[in-house]
């Protein structure tokens, strides 16, 4: 998963994407059920299925019958109305472009989940192509026939994505995969004859590279039947060779060249030292391979590899750039000069460069500060580059760059919703010291307040990102802006050691048993808040999803005197039980990051830093949210910490989504989650 994807996932887990405006005085507080104003009449709630949870007393939440809760009071109708009113902000995800650059395939949400849409001209009408209840994540045009699409779709949040074929002429959709394995990383050959993707179909544990002809996609051939995780990256022109990645962890991956017909493979990167591999692509003539890796330096850089002589030292095209290269696009038009485009992550913001493939000469493209992604050169147009762009104050939309003139053309305009744009804020980048000489970078968002001359101490919400190999960046987050503008709180998004974007030494600084030392970054964050004249250390809440959920629980357990409230979304409560019960296909990948719990010395450290082991120390009010179908952090991680705190007493809210997995994707669940989270923060942080 790319750093940007990891970041976006972390924000999605902790805060669903909703909108806001500043009316602090009108936000009602959560009340006891008997005293609450009547909520709008919900649809009849189904009887919960037998045994959905080990927590007794769970009942469907009004308006979200698949969300079962206990300890959560009735949410005031006015607050639900506020959430619904600001729940319609949208963003556009660039998925693919036709070979001539005249049609764009994008993902956006008009109903409950993200679906496929087609745009056929700049600022043209969006035509919806898929209408399922489950979200669509990846999609590709068939190059020689853009009426045919292949896409990956989830089911119930379990992340066992299935591959489908859609013919736009007949609207016929056909399931290509087996309906039960996990499938990902779809690539299509330049000519459109072949497809490749990663699949766990063989044994549920190992991830193989699968090949199919696009005309007969159900006839499939496994190109790898090896232990571990393998995925396809790019076909060579002609489709006879395929770049594949072997991944042991986020910091340990190798690049291979696979002969499609014979199955023979050749290593393109040396065995040592271990290094990350972000992506790799063939040149338009297939004679060179461009890869983004930190194998030859401290940061991820663009290198040119000769596949005929992989043992030779590669040409390091961006060795002078002191920041991570985060994405790569290579033009496919063989009748035009070779063209590359990259982004560089400088202090959390993306810079776009065009790269001369031979010399590595960089040509900056001036764009507003923000985040970029989804880069695509149309196969037959090396003079056009499509990309998605967002800033902290504007939703993600799709743009096109004319490479010759450097002019950009907007293709989509996503709705902001009924938000006063003047209330949206940009963050300030701050740094503060932690143990061992580490400097922790963080983004601070503060509400716009009238200049009265008084210093007002603001309550603070700390948002921990997931991963842990993620990075907090200034993405467009309507809910983060809601917290700032509506609740009047400051939001701090730290990048503790172990985050991407600051070099591989910083990334590895929390690996294995070093995680115990890295938890001191939590204390450093709280100390920094206490040292600020305009932040209130007596009113601090923390939240986060996945690994950010672990940090949320860890803050509550190990810094109990410095915290008022915590909102844990699909977080790890015990590393030992997490590693034993996470899906088999990802268990070894996570052991490479957290340590092997089967080693007694490692197990002792993991137990010591697990919040469940110190649950009796938690004093803060706690709200735990979990998806029943989570393949990454199982439901038991949430329920064992809830049970421990219920026995101890105190404020504990719990919500379980029956039709979600690792985070909440359905709009009705996200709306209910946000309404409850706002009510929780009002009761526990702002009173």
Show which residues each predicted segment covers.
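Bacterial N-terminal signal peptides that target proteins for export
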Residues: 1-8
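Bacterial N-terminal signal peptides
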Residues: 8-16
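Boundary at the C-terminal end of the N-terminal hydrophobic targeting segment
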Residues: 19-25
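Blade/loop signatures of beta-propeller domains
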Residues: 53-82
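Peripheral, non-catalytic segments that deliver or gate enzyme domains
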Residues: 86-93, 103, 111-117, 131-457, ...
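Hydrophobic beta-strand anchors of alpha/beta hydrolase catalytic cores
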Residues: 461-463, 491
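The conserved beta1-alpha1 loop
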Residues: 464-466, 626
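Active-site-proximal cap/loop segments of hydrolase catalytic domains
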Residues: 493-687
């Amino acid at each position: 998963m790319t750093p940007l994807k990891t970041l976006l996932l972390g924000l999605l887990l902790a805060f669903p994407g909703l909108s806001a405006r500043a009316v602090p005085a009108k936000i009602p507080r959560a009340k006891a059920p008997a005293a609450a104003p009547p909520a709008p009449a919900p649809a009849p709630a189904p009887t919960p299925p037998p045994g959905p949870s080990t927590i007794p007393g769970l009942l469907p939440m009004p308006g979200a019958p698949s969300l079962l809760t206990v300890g959560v009071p009735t949410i005031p109708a006015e607050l639900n109305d506020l959430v619904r009113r600001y729940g319609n902000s949208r963003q556009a995800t660039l998925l693919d472009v036709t070979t001539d650059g005249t049609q764009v395939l994008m993902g956006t949400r008009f109903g409950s989940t993200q679906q496929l849409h087609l745009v056929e001209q700049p600022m043209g009408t969006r035509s919806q192509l898929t209408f399922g209840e489950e979200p669509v994540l990846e999609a590709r045009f068939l190059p020689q026939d853009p009426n045919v699409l292949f896409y990956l779709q989830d089911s119930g949040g379990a992340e066992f994505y299935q591959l489908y074929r859609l013919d736009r002429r007949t609207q016929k959709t056909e399931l290509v995969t087996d309906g039960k394995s996990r499938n990902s990383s779809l690539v299509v050959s330049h000519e459109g004859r072949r497809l490749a993707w990663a699949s766990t179909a063989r044994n549920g544990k190992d991830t193989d590279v699968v090949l199919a002809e696009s005309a007969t996609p159900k006839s499939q051939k496994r190109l790898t039947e090896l232990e571990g995780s393998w995925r396809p990256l790019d076909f060579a022109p002609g489709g006879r060779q395929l770049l594949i990645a072997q991944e042991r962890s986020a910091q340990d991956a190798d690049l291979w060249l696979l002969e499609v017909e014979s199955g023979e493979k050749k290593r393109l990167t040396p065995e040592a030292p271990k290094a990350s591999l972000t992506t790799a692509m063939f040149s338009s003539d297939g004679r060179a391979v461009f890869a983004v890796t930190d194998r030859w330096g401290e940061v991820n850089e663009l290198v040119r590899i000769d596949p005929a002589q992989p043992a030779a030292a590669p040409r390091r095209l961006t060795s002078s750039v002191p920041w991570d290269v985060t994405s790569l696009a290579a033009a496919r038009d063989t009748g035009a000069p070779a063209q590359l485009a990259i982004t560089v992550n400088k202090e959390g913001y993306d810079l776009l460069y065009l790269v001369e493939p031979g010399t590595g000469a960089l040509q900056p493209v001036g764009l507003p500060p923000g985040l970029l992604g989804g880069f695509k050169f149309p196969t037959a147009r090396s003079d056009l580059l499509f990309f998605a762009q967002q800033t902290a104050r504007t939703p993600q939309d799709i743009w096109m760059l004319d490479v010759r003139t450097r002019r950009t053309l907007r293709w989509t305009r996503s709705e902001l919703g009924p938000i006063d744009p003047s209330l949206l804020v940009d963050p300030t980048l701050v740094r503060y010291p932690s143990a061992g000489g580490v400097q922790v970078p963080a983004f601070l968002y503060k509400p716009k307040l009238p200049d009265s001359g008084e210093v007002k101490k603001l309550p603070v919400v700390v948002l921990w990102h997931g991963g842990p190999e993620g990075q907090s960046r200034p993405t467009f987050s309507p809910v983060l802006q809601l917290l700032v503008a509506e609740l009047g709180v400051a939001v701090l998004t730290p990048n503790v050691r172990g985050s991407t974007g600051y070099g591989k030494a910083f990334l590895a600084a929390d690996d294995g048993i070093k995680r115990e030392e890295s938890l001191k970054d939590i204390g450093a964050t709280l100390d920094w808040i206490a040292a600020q004249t305009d932040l209130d250390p007596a009113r601090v809440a923390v939240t986060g999803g996945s690994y950010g959920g672990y940090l949320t629980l860890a803050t509550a357990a190990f810094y109990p005197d410095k915290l008022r409230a915590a909102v844990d979304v699909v977080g790890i409560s015990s590393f030992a039980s997490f590693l034993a019960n996470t899906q088999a296909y990802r268990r070894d990948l996570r052991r490479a990051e957290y340590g092997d719990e089967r080693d007694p010395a490692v197990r002792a450290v993991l137990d010591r830093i697990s919040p469940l082991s110190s649950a009796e120390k938690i004093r803060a009010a706690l709200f735990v949210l979990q998806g029943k179908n989570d393949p990454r952090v199982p439901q038991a991680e949430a329920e064992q910490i809830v049970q421990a705190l219920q026995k101890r007493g105190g404020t504990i809210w719990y919500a379980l989504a029956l039709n979600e997995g690792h985070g909440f994707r359905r709009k009705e669940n996200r709306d209910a989650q946000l309404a409850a989270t706002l009510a929780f923060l009002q009761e526990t942080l702002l009173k």
